[in-house]
UniProtKB/Swiss-Prot annotation:
Gene name tied to this protein: Hsp70Bbb
Biological process, per Gene Ontology: chaperone cofactor-dependent protein refolding; heat shock-mediated polytene chromosome puffing; protein refolding; response to heat; response to hypoxia
Pfam families, alphabetized: HSP70
Induction remarks: Heat shock induces the synthesis of seven proteins at five otherwise inactive sites in the polytene chromosomes of fruit fly larvae. Two separate sites, producing two and three copies, respectively, code for the 70 kDa protein. Expression is induced by proteotoxic stress caused by toxic protein aggregation, for example by overexpressed Atx-1/ataxin-1.
Keyword ATP-binding assigned: yes
Residue ranges of the region described as Disordered: 609-641
InterPro entries according to UniProt: ATPase_NBD (IPR043129), Heat_shock_70_CS (IPR018181), HSP70_C_sf (IPR029048), HSP70_peptide-bd_sf (IPR029047), Hsp_70_fam (IPR013126)
Function: Stress-response chaperone protein that prevents toxic aggregation of proteins.
Organism: Drosophila melanogaster (Fruit fly)
Additional note from the record: There are 5 or 6 copies of the gene encoding this protein at two separate loci, 2 copies at chromosome locus 87A7 in reverse orientation (Hsp70Aa and Hsp70Ab) at locus 87A7, and 3 or 4 copies (depending on strain) at locus 87C1. Most strains have three copies at chromosome locus 87C1; two tandemly repeated Hsp70 genes (Hsp70Bb and Hsp70Bc) and one in reverse orientation (Hsp70Ba). Some strains, including that sequenced in the Drosophila genome project have an additional copy making three tandemly repeated Hsp70 genes (Hsp70Bb, Hsp70Bbb and Hsp70Bc).
Protein name, UniProt field: Major heat shock 70 kDa protein Bbb
Amino acid sequence: MPAIGIDLGTTYSCVGVYQHGKVEIIANDQGNRTTPSYVAFTDSERLIGDPAKNQVAMNPRNTVFDAKRLIGRKYDDPKIAEDMKHWPFKVVSDGGKPKIGVEYKGESKRFAPEEISSMVLTKMKETAEAYLGESITDAVITVPAYFNDSQRQATKDAGHIAGLNVLRIINEPTAAALAYGLDKNLKDERNVLIFDLGGGTFDVSILTIDEGSLFEVRSTAGDTHLGGEDFDNRLVTHLAEEFKRKYKKDLRSNPRALRRLRTAAERAKRTLSSSTEATIEIDALFEGQDFYTKVSRARFEELCADLFRNTLQPVEKALNDAKMDKGQIHDIVLVGGSTRIPKVQSLLQEFFHGKNLNLSINPDEAVAYGAAVQAAILSGDQSGKIQDVLLVDVAPLSLGIETAGGVMTKLIERNCRIPCKQTKTFSTYSDNQPGVSIQVYEGERAMTKDNNALGTFDLSGIPPAPRGVPQIEVTFDLDANGILNVSAKEMSTGKAKNITIKNDKGRLSQAEIDRMVNEAEKYADEDEKHRQRITSRNALESYVFNVKQSVEQAPAGKLDEADKNSVLDKCNETIRWLDSNTTAEKEEFDHKMEELTRHCSPIMTKMHQQGAGAAGGPGANCGQQAGGFGGYSGPTVEEVD
């Protein structure tokens, strides 16, 4: 059973598999190689991917996207407050964690960001299963290099809820570097800078790639809250203000108008990567008012100027941390859809004194490509190209504990190789202190109050002794997923305690995860039931219209008037029933089908026999479907609304 690689993106996701010595990026059921990270809830069903994004203007309040901007964060995070201004769906606080409130099948539901992400992951898993023809459980999932511990844990939880065994969480730029290194058959030692600007996150990583097989991350930097969505937001704000100026109407109070404007803005942004001007035309945008305008590339660049410039700070930081200067970088590789923006490219090129940028890998697919390679390596694939690949990654943030006076004492420095283990000895602060509280933080500031609290635990039972005498050994063990285990041991008694850091404010408990796994299965069953219901409805609809058409077009003399009227009456009655019972259950559609078949089949058979008797030649059976009218055989045609 192959393992898959999933790029779980803010706006789009992508899945790949390594087979027969190469990576296949797998297209979804719509034929697209990337799938929108959107989940929509309606009064009858749940939609994931393209169908969800396609109906967003009709159902903005119950269509959820950007789950990656919520995952592993606390509700009071200032970034979330900023984002909520742009989201049409409702985000509420549930014990300090953000939850997304929607209406589903007439009921109010609350979902954790992990659950929404797990639905997208389930879609990617199903896409791969449809292509490979077998069930999949093992996967490598990518995260931004700058994701912190709680965001990584939450992503792993989302995989678990989706029924995946997450082999490894790997960093997106590292995955892209794998794709680049293997695709290009690199020789010698090369320093490669990966510039990864996606829909919602931004990462810069510098790697040394040796002979295309040793991939060593030297440094990483970034912003988990900068990407294409932020550029869209600037454009939407600009267009909404222009609309208000022109027509004295503020459309920002209307989620549907705002969503239509956002879709047009996103399209214009893409156009501006290849043209110097984009036209926006939206009919009846707000209160019947059409909106036609033009946006120039120069205006768009001016609107986002500070955001574009902000991409260079992490580049500078990554170079400093790797102790390299600009001239030592051999290749600059662009990853993520937003790197198609000409201004982003020109700023980066100027920063590197006119050095050519490498545009040779597909920016949308490179991360999934690398994840698929890593999945194959971790599941023991020994094929030629990847058997020698060794990937050495680093910790994005420093990790430490709080010592007297609120000082951050670091045990693991940022950019140290992972997996890694560090031990330090601490002591008590006051005489006869019976226990110590170990408070774990991540971040670069000197005082813990300015850093991110990860978790805390108490070690009790320390024998009475003057301050400074007891020896407490604290060990930080950072695993290959970038997830932290902390243990503390009192040396004289040998008493020990350890925790895997589970950021309690941002993390899900095991019980919550188990509940979500069960709910995910329930939703999958509901989706399947809905699909079967639609299949039964379509079968009945198709049958009734076929019978009606055959009878209406039957040549004179083939069918006596009484039979003809009897069939037409029954068909018209069924059509009326269909129109007024659109939400009927599968069993009701099946029952109607049986009823109609019982009534019509004998008459249809008689009609065809008469026809055959009269004509007696070949082709006399042309009105009847293969398999008979009562059967379900013959090809099923998907009908599009």
